[in-house]
């Protein structure tokens, strides 16, 4: 009879009978060195496999000497892992088997396994379940042959796989690192254990724990590709529906021949549906040569050892948010304040402060804030919550120690990151005076001061306040209406306040919001100014604080519609600029002009015609010369968002050039109309030059030279990339339960992921252009799994291998792979006609066609640009035109995160991708469904997977991680697709952004320098 050696199975408990046998064992690390090869969270632990093997071995001792043909453990429940400390702590494990039914051919019983850490500790259940042993001579019938493995399995490098398990807290070494090779695709894995020599191989075990542990490992491999992030925490076995072993096969790591492990994961229970998420699958172990079944695991369930927390959430989704510059609406004209009553749309002063602060922090991340005066707890709490990581510090200055302690006490329970100081704001300090004890010493360093309950005409207080703010910083001041002239004389009041503020170094009243419910108070916004800030605020009304004798170059005016606005802009610039202002009509004229002595360039050529549309070689040469040789460029586009997708493509190209040459300053300005914005364009150009000059100096002013701006309805909008909380919640609820909340933290229902079955119909056909590779196959499987049945895949050169389509056809799907070039309109018309003649109506279209050709922009050729543009630009336009009359549920375009950050050496690729963003916005403006997906690097599929077998993937992954790119798993790809389909018909911006890692110890990569990402790093 085969069984475990005594050092694992233990000795029989005194008093046990033939029908109630039991064993006891005290485990110590020093006694069982082999157990040191398994760690959970860096702690030595008893593998779950040992629990199962002990039960199997003990079962042999109730067989009454009969030779068992099979042993089954079923309905097995497994408790928490048993940790073994390095100190001499004893953990006692006991097993008691209570017979159930027995007969000549089989025995059935129940078993339980308990542990205790000492005589005074009550036993804790480790595992329990039922067992069955069969004795009839039917072994050959039980040992079924191996089935054909699923198609599309891809090789996995073993060392990175085990390393990825170690990164989440599962450490395997020695015999427990048993897999020698493996393959996988999502939900399937195949592993091989080769014959082993050494001490472990001489263990005469019925089933070595390492063999069973390898089965568990393959289920994890089926769930997640190495380092794809899907395995976010430690998963261990918690249930086994049935474990069947055939003793005569004696499968262990000492097996003289290799064995193959086939695993199919067939169920994932998300965290929002249970206390813990679960994965469940079936595992079969075969002899590699004969292909005969040796071990069968059915209903193997693995779960995290503890509930996930917010720290383990993955912030995969980002969104581009445009908010107005707080000063871009009402402006000062000839020293007169112009007021806006409804700027914030809020009735109460605290809400006005909150709304204004949000706009300020949108542009200026990491604000250093000083609140002068006590306030309600709600205001402080709301400000801290609204700003979050966008706030560098928040200091509350109180009039006295008693008021400070009172404020501290009221906010104590909120655990907010607040500093407290005592400040007599009415005391005037002259240069050389020392602040009183407890007062802030960092004079002139605050970005924003919130002055509460102020007197509007108190010059000493305002002067002292000005000394605390850096130039460019802001003052938000609340004033009680009773302290001012009655509202009937409000024009006189505002003028007086405006003059007082200007007299102490502020801009005056930039914005004023009164309480419309009771006229009890009003909120004033003003900016701390010096000679530089005055010019940046109003370039045409201030003396430039820098020389203006250089040469400016203005490009544009070749068309009739742009000629007059451009001449107006040129004349406006001459009011301020003393140097030469040169006007050339088009980029082609740059071929005869050098740019070495040009200080800055204003490119208005997109107002004439989109540069990338019908791009000629001469125009490309001029574009190349402009972006390669210029130092400062303001690149103006016209409605790139919803009218001119080719101009959106040019934006992507400029982003890449900026990232590749950080010594240049390339600013993008999109205007919503050509006429009427000439003054704003001229101001923006001068502001860009002035901002660059100021940043080149030693100024500590609060000012940003924005990489991108947009003008909508006369207001200047500023973009920032922010976390997309709603979509991240829908992703992370797969890991844990979390509440969906609105901006005021009103709890609603639990967050839920999108149900993909609601997105597809068995009575519609879905067209995937340029998606015949691994990613397209994965998407096709997902569509079929989600209820779709008819899919057409087009490719210029489709793969002849149709095994994967036959696999899906066995599930009732109809897959057609057609040879067609997405850039050729007639070929796609033919595809559509074939579909309509033989398949259901078309319900969705996606374009995943792409071509890459990376190089420095200085080395980019006209041909390389055109080649890369065609699949994404021409292909997307063809799909838009050919399928525009179909009632589509989705129109998906696959872009890349590189288009968002501006990836160096990929200017052509970024241009192609960002064109897609423009086309999607244009389609939505036409009320057609559309969405674009800016994907991060996919792991487990495609390029990274294809180089995995040679070990090259580790180098690629290391490079991507060094750039703080977030790896996207295949499961997350499907989640992204569902979000993209849903957003394509909504009122939201139809853009999904993924793939940036925001928490990293790496040196800051290139994209961290862009203000676009200042809120996520």
From Swiss-Prot:
Keywords: Oxidoreductase. Fumagillin and its derivatives have been intensely studied for their potential use in the treatment of amebiasis, microsporidiosis and rheumatoid arthritis. They have also interesting antiangiogenic properties by the irreversible inhibition of human type 2 methionine aminopeptidase (METAP2). SUPFAM superfamilies: NAD(P)-binding Rossmann-fold domains, S-adenosyl-L-methionine-dependent methyltransferases. It comes from Aspergillus fumigatus (strain ATCC MYA-4609 / CBS 101355 / FGSC A1100 / Af293). InterPro entries: NAD(P)-bd_dom_sf, PKS_dehydratase_sf, PKS_DH, PKS_DH_C, PKS_DH_N, PKS_KR, PKS_mFAS_DH, PKS_NRPS_Biosynth_Enz. The keyword Oxidoreductase applies. It is an enzyme of class 1 (oxidoreductase). Residues 6-311 form the PKS/mFAS DH domain. Gene3D superfamilies: NAD(P)-binding Rossmann-like Domain (3.40.50.720), Polyketide synthase dehydratase (3.10.129.110), Vaccinia Virus protein VP39 (3.40.50.150). This is Stereoselective keto-reductase af490. The keyword Plastid does not apply. It comes from the Eukaryota. Stereoselective keto-reductase; part of the gene cluster that mediates the biosynthesis of fumagillin, a meroterpenoid that has numerous biological activities including irreversible inhibition of human type 2 methionine aminopeptidase (METAP2). Within the pathway, the keto-reductase af490 acts as a 5-dehydrofumagillol 5-reductase that stereoselectively reduces 5-keto-fumagillol to 5R-hydroxy-seco-sesquiterpene. The pathway begins with the conversion of farnesyl pyrophosphate (FPP) to beta-trans-bergamotene by the membrane-bound beta-trans-bergamotene synthase af520. It catalyses: fumagillol + NADP(+) = 5-dehydrofumagillol + NADPH + H(+). Pathway: Secondary metabolite biosynthesis; terpenoid biosynthesis. PANTHER family: FATTY ACID SYNTHASE (PTHR43775), STEREOSELECTIVE KETO-REDUCTASE AF490 (PTHR43775:SF52). Residues 8-306 are annotated as: Dehydratase (DH). One of its GO terms (molecular function) is fatty acid synthase activity. Its EC number is 1.1.1.437. Residues 153-311 are annotated as: C-terminal hotdog fold. Residues 6-138 are annotated as: N-terminal hotdog fold. Signal peptide: none annotated.
């Amino acid at each position: 009879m085969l069984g475990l050696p005594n050092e694992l199975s233990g000795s029989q408990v005194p008093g046990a009978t033939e029908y109630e046998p039991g064993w006891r064992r005290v485990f110590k690390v020093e006694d069982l060195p082999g157990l040191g090869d398994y760690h959970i969270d860096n702690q030595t632990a008893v593998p779950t496999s040992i629990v199962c093997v002990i039960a199997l071995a003990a079962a042999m001792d109730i067989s009454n000497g009969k030779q068992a043909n099979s042993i089954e453990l079923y309905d097995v429940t497994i408790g928490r892992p048993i940790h073994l400390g390095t100190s001499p702590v004893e953990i006692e494990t006991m097993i008691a088997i209570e017979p159930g039914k027995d007969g000549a051919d089989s025995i059935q019983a129940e078993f339980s396994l308990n542990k205790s850490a000492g005589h005074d500790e009550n036993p804790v259940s480790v595992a329990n379940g039922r067992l069955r042993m069969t004795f009839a001579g039917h072994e050959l019938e039980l040992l079924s042959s191996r089935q054909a493995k699923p198609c599309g399995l891809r090789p996995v490098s073993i060392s990175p796989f085990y390393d990825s398990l170690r990164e989440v807290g599962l450490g395997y070494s020695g015999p427990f690192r048993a897999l020698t090779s493996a393959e996988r695709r999502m939900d399937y894995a195949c592993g091989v254990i080769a014959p082993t020599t050494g001490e472990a191989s001489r263990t005469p075990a019925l089933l070595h724990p390492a063999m069973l542990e390898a089965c568990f490992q393959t289920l994890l491999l089926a769930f997640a590709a190495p380092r794809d992030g899907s395995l976010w925490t430690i998963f261990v076995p918690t249930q086994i529906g049935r474990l069947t072993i055939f003793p005569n096969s004696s499968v262990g790591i000492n097996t003289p021949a290799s064995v193959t492990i086939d695993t199919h994961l067939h169920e994932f229970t998300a965290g929002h549906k249970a206390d813990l998420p679960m994965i469940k699958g079936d595992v079969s172990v075969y002899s590699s040569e004969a292909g005969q079944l040796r071990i069968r695991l059915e209903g193997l369930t693995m779960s995290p050892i503890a509930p996930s927390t917010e720290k383990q959430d993955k912030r995969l989704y980002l969104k581009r948010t445009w908010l107005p510059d707080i000063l871009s609406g009402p402006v000062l004209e000839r020293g007169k304040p112009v007021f806006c009553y409804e700027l914030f749309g809020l009735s109460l002063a605290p809400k006005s402060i909150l709304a204004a602060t949000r706009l300020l922090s949108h542009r200026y991340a990491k604000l250093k804030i000083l609140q002068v005066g006590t306030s309600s707890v709600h205001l402080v709490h709301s400000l801290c919550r609204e700003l979050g990581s966008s706030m560098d510090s928040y200091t509350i200055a109180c009039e006295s120690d008693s008021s400070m302690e009172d404020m501290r006490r009221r906010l104590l329970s909120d655990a907010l990151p607040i500093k407290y100081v005592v400040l007599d704001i009415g005391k005037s300090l002259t240069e050389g005076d020392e602040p009183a004890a407890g007062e802030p010493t960092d004079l002139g360093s605050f970005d924003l001061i919130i002055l509460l309950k102020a007197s509007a005409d108190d010059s000493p207080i305002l002067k002292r306040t000005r000394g605390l703010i850096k130039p460019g910083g802001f003052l938000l001041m609340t004033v009680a209406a009773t302290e001012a002239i009655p509202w009937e004389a409000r024009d006189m009041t505002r003028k007086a306040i405006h003059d007082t503020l200007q007299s102490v170094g502020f801009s005056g009243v930039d914005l004023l919001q009164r309480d419309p419910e009771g006229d009890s108070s009003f909120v004033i916004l003003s900016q701390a100014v010096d000679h530089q800030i005055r010019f940046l605020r109003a370039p045409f009304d201030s003396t430039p604080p820098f020389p203006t004798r250089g040469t400016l170059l203005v490009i544009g005016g070749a068309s009739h519609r742009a000629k007059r606005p451009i001449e107006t802009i040129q004349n406006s610039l001459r009011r301020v600029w003393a140097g030469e202002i040169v006007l050339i009509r088009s980029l082609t004229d740059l071929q005869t002009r050098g740019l070495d002595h040009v200080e800055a360039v204003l490119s208005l050529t997109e107002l004439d015609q989109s540069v990338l549309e019908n791009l000629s070689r001469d125009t490309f040469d001029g574009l190349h010369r402009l972006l390669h040789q210029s130092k400062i460029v303001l690149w103006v586009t016209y409605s790139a968002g919803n009218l001119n997708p080719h101009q959106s493509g040019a934006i992507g190209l400029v982003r890449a050039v900026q990232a590749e040459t950080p010594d240049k300053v390339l600013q993008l300005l999109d205007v919503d109309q050509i006429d009427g914005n000439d003054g704003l364009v001229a101001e923006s150009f001068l502001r860009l030059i002035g901002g660059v000059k100021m940043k080149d100096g030693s100024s500590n002013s609060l000012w940003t030279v924005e990489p991108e701006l947009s003008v909508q309805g006369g207001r200047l909008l500023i973009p920032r990339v922010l976390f997309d909380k709603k979509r991240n919640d829908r992703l992370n609820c797969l890991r844990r339960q979390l509440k969906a909340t609105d901006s005021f933290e009103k709890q609603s229902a639990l967050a839920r992921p999108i149900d993909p079955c609601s997105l597809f119909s068995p009575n519609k056909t879905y067209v995937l252009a340029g998606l015949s590779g691994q990613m397209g196959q994965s998407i096709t499987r997902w569509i079929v799994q989600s209820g779709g049945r008819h899919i057409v895949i087009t490719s210029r050169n489709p793969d002849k291998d149709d095994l994967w389509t036959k696999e899906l056809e066995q599930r009732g799907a109809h897959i057609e792979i057609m040879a067609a070039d997405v850039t050729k309109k007639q070929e796609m018309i033919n595809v559509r006609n074939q579909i309509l003649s033989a398949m259901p109506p078309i319900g969705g279209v996606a374009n995943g066609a792409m071509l890459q050709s990376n190089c420095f922009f200085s080395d980019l050729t006209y041909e390389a640009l055109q080649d890369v543009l065609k699949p994404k630009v021409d292909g997307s336009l063809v799909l838009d035109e050919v399928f525009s009359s179909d009632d589509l549920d989705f129109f998906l375009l696959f872009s890349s995160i590189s288009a968002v950050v501006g990836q160096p050496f990929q200017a052509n690729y970024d241009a192609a991708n960002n064109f897609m963003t423009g086309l999607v916005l244009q389609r939505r403006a036409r009320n057609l469904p559309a969405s674009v997906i800016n994907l991060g690097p996919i792991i487990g599929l495609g390029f990274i997977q294809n180089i995995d077998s040679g070990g090259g993937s580790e180098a690629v992954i290391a490079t991507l991680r060094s750039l703080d790119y977030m790896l996207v798993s295949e499961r997350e790809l499907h989640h992204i697709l569902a979000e993209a389909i849903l957003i394509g018909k909504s009122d939201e911006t139809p853009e999904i952004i993924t793939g940036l890692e925001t928490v990293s110890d790496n040196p800051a990569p290139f994209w961290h320098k862009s203000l676009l990402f200042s809120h996520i790093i």
